[in-house]
């Protein structure tokens, strides 16, 4: 009997409202352009929104355009979705509802939207939720002020600013679209993604919840929150958030430990600190005022080291010069100071076919090691060092820089040390001062070689001149050849002055008429002009292959003396008496 009475009351209410409709016609809703129906050929017929339950049914001419509204525990259904609210205004003819207060929309695939207000169109299956909107699905939660929801395309969109939380990261953006089927968030404009370790900031991103990956389509920065100076920048790339791996494809940089790696295509692993670059690679170290360019590079953030290959070269800015170095491979690394382990020293190593150019000095070797902090440069395996019209070779050469003015202070040559200096740089005469021995130390003054100390089987060949104090005319005395345990030689503009020749000293000056040209050079004389870099670009090739200078040998006096000597020898020979044979 009670059930019959309830049905009777509902039918009576509908009948009464129907009669009222004839007297006070209902006003259709004012719809947002979002609800405009698209012309879709062969589209399936739409279903009508159904009212399932409410505590009361009402209609007032001065409320909601005279349309029915339902109050108290209201429930409507449409195409598998359930809408509940405190009040729902039902525009029955337009198949449209407006829900007010504690609105909840649950879809058939488990998505849940809560809001203070919501409009839903049964014709387009689209809804607009407003005020304290939260969309929850198994992968994430979206919070915003206004959310546009399309059940047909299964997308949710906002442009009034919102946050997305997946339990691991919180994302903020002004505008985003959530593609529910593919679990993909597309952010347009500025966005921020925050988790416990990193912050991602940029423009335009597609973030996939199923795989926890992100594709970048605009300027993007990924910052280490524990160390904000370490960050990654790109304008196109991919971020694997679970693996903490980043692939960078356009205008990309990796900032780590005060250094910057750039390249055409790059990769970085946040867990291991390993990164690499391919194509137009550049490694900048602003603290050391040095950068390295090459075709390929790797960095090891936790070891604070890096490697650059594929025709690499390094450029280091000094206070009064610039050092250019090329090789087949470069390594850079930091190492704790042996005295104070709270400080680190910076090292640069180069391997295979090393070439170096500075304005005042040039060098070649098989490999190189540079302690940049202490200013010590080591050349290994067949090193050769040029400075002005002077050349030094040996088994190993060490260059020591003044750390204040960054000029060369001295050189140490270990094993088969050999220094050669052109007697007169303004002429093409084949005349060279030479000093050699086991060990050699060369001291610099104003970036020029000034003094050489040679220890162990020290030998020298120098050209001796005399100068008239009045006329300043210089006359050649001859060639001085010395053999000592130790030699100190002073380099001057046009000569080497032997300051000391100690321990078993033997020496003699030979007039030019009494020393053959081949005796004026040591057997291992190796003056090299073909491989010397004359400009910084020369280091970019294995050898500049300069045209070798052709020096003129001045042997006039020696030849004349030889002619006289040979004539004298001829005169001293006994004469042979010819005898006639008797028949």
Model-derived features with residue positions:
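Sec/Tat signal peptide C-region and signal peptidase I cleavage site
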Residues: 14-18
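Positively charged n-region of N-terminal signal peptides that target proteins for export
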Residues: 1-4, 19
């Amino acid at each position: 009997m009670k059930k019959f009475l309830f049905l009777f009351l509902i039918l009576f209410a509908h009948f009464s409202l129907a009669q009222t409709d004839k007297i006070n016609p209902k006003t259709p809703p004012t719809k947002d352009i979002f609800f405009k129906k698209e012309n879709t050929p062969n589209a399936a017929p739409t279903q009508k929104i159904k009212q399932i339950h409410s505590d009361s049914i009402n209609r007032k001419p001065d409320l909601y355009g005279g349309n029915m509204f339902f109050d108290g525990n209201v429930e409507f259904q449409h195409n598998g979705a359930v809408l509940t609210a405190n009040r729902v205004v039902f525009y029955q003819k337009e198949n449209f509802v407006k829900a007010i207060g504690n609105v909840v929309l649950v879809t058939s695939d488990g998505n849940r939207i809560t809001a203070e207000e919501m409009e839903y169109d049964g014709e387009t299956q689209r809804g607009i939720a407003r005020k304290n909107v939260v969309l929850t699905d198994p992968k994430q939660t979206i919070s915003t002020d206004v959310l546009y929801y399309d059940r047909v395309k299964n997308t949710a969109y906002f442009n009034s600013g919102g946050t997305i939380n997946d339990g691991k990261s919180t994302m903020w953006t002004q505008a985003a679209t959530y593609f529910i089927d593919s679990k993909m968030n597309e952010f347009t404009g500025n966005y921020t993604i925050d988790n416990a370790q990193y912050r991602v900031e940029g423009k335009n991103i597609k973030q996939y919840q199923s795989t926890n990956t992100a594709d970048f389509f605009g300027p993007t920065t990924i910052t280490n929150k524990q160390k904000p100076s370490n960050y990654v920048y790109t304008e196109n790339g991919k971020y694997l958030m679970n693996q903490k791996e980043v692939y960078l494809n356009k205008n990309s940089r990796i900032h780590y430990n005060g250094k910057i790696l750039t390249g055409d295509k790059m990769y970085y692993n946040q867990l291991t600190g390993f990164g690499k670059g391919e194509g137009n690679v550049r490694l900048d170290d602003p603290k050391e005022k040095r950068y390295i360019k090459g075709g390929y590079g790797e960095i090891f953030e936790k070891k604070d080291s890096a490697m650059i290959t594929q025709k690499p070269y390094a450029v280091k800015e000094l206070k009064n010069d610039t050092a250019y170095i090329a090789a087949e491979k470069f390594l850079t690394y930091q190492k704790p100071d042996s005295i104070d382990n709270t400080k680190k020293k910076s090292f640069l190593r180069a391997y295979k076919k090393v070439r170096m150019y500075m304005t005042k000095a040039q060098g070649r070797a098989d490999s190189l090691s540079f302690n940049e902090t202490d200013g010590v440069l080591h050349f290994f395996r067949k090193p050769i060092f040029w400075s002005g019209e002077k050349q030094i070779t040996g088994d190993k050469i060490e260059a020591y820089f003044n750390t204040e003015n960054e000029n060369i202070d001295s050189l140490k040559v270990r094993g088969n040390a050999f220094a050669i200096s052109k007697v007169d740089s303004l002429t093409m005469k084949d005349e060279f001062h030479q000093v050699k021995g086991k060990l050699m130390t060369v001291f610099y003054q104003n970036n020029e070689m000034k003094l050489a100390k040679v220890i162990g089987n020290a030998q020298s060949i120098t050209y001796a001149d005399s100068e008239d104090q009045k006329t300043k005319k210089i006359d050649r005395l001859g060639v001085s050849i010395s053999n000592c345990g130790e030699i100190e030689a002073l380099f001057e503009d046009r000569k080497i002055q032997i300051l000391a020749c100690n321990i078993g000293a033997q020496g003699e000056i030979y007039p030019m008429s009494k020393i053959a040209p081949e005796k004026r050079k040591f057997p291992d004389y190796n003056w090299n002009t073909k491989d010397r870099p004359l400009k910084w670009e020369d280091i970019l090739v294995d050898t500049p292959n300069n045209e070798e200078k052709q020096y003129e040998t001045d042997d006039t006096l020696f030849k004349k003396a030889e002619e006289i000597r040979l004539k004298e020898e001829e005169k001293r020979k006994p004469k042979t008496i010819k005898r006639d044979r008797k028949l």
